[in-house]
């Protein structure tokens, strides 16, 4: 996509359109596996009950079944591949698509059904090898995920070398770490604290070269604060 002789806006549109088509196709395949159905036969029992209030779908009438949704996404993917493989790509690329990841907004537990019942209670979108994206694509992708903050659960994997020094050093509370005040926590659970400390001390004692079997026997029964 980056090598096409088209505008940056068109590249962005093609990139998100290709991502959307692949996410939709992968989700439909996963839905068949979830319900132990053969693919693509099981697609007819899957429904997308989306009201198209945001006008995301122009050539697809929704609500629709999985077979219709699969055909729509496959057609977009084919058209993008034709554009990429063309030796002389048209200046005005015409592909039905979007400037955002509509797949994450549309493919929700509230919109997906199987044989008239909810397909699942939660969905996790997993993006592997994000480091293989070009720098502009990776930046667009991450920026959208962070800024949109949709209700979708998204998991992204990439090699460490793809991260900038700032990304490698930056950490966020709740995502990378959780601050826990041990004193406040154990004050509410003194018996648990005693049990944990005894367990730790006995394991340390077992590793001692002094043939110490229990750390507790070396402690005074009554300790007074000074």
What are these regions (language model features)?
Residues 88-110:
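Short glycine-rich substrate-engagement loop in P-loop NTPases that contacts/grips substrate
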Residues 128-129:
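Walker B catalytic acidic pair
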Residues 17-86:
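Coupling/switch/interface segments within P-loop NTPase motor domains and analogous charged loops
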Residues 31, 35, 81-84, 88, ...:
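Residue-level signal for secondary-structure boundary elements
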Residues 15, 19, 23, 137, ...:
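Short amphipathic alpha-helical segments
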Residues 1-6:
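Nucleic acid-processing catalytic cores of prokaryotic defense/repair systems
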Residues 102-109, 114-124, 133-226:
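The catalytic "switch" region of P-loop NTPases
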């Amino acid at each position: 996509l980056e090598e096409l002789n088209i505008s940056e806006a068109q590249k962005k549109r093609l990139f998100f359109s290709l991502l959307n088509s692949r996410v939709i196709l992968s989700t439909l395949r996963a839905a068949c596996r979830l319900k132990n159905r053969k693919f693509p036969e099981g697609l007819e029992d899957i429904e997308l009950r989306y009201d198209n209030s945001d006008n995301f779908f122009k050539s697809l009438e929704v609500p629709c079944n999985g077979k219709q949704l699969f055909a729509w996404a496959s057609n977009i993917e084919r058209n993008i591949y034709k554009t990429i493989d063309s030796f002389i790509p048209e200046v005005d690329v015409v592909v039905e698509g979007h400037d955002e990841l509509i797949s994450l907004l549309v493919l929700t537990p509230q919109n997906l059904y199987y044989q008239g019942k909810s397909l699942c209670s939660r969905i996790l979108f997993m993006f592997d090898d994000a480091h293989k994206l070009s720098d502009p694509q990776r930046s667009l992708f991450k920026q959208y995920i962070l800024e949109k903050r949709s209700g979708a659960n998204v998991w992204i994997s990439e090699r460490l070398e793809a991260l900038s020094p700032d990304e490698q050093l930056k950490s966020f509370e709740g995502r990378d770490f959780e601050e826990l005040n041990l004193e406040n926590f154990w004050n509410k659970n003194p018996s648990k604290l005693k049990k944990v400390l005894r367990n730790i001390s006995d394991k340390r004692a077992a590793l001692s070269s002094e043939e110490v079997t229990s750390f507790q026997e070396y402690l005074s029964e009554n300790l007074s604060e000074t």
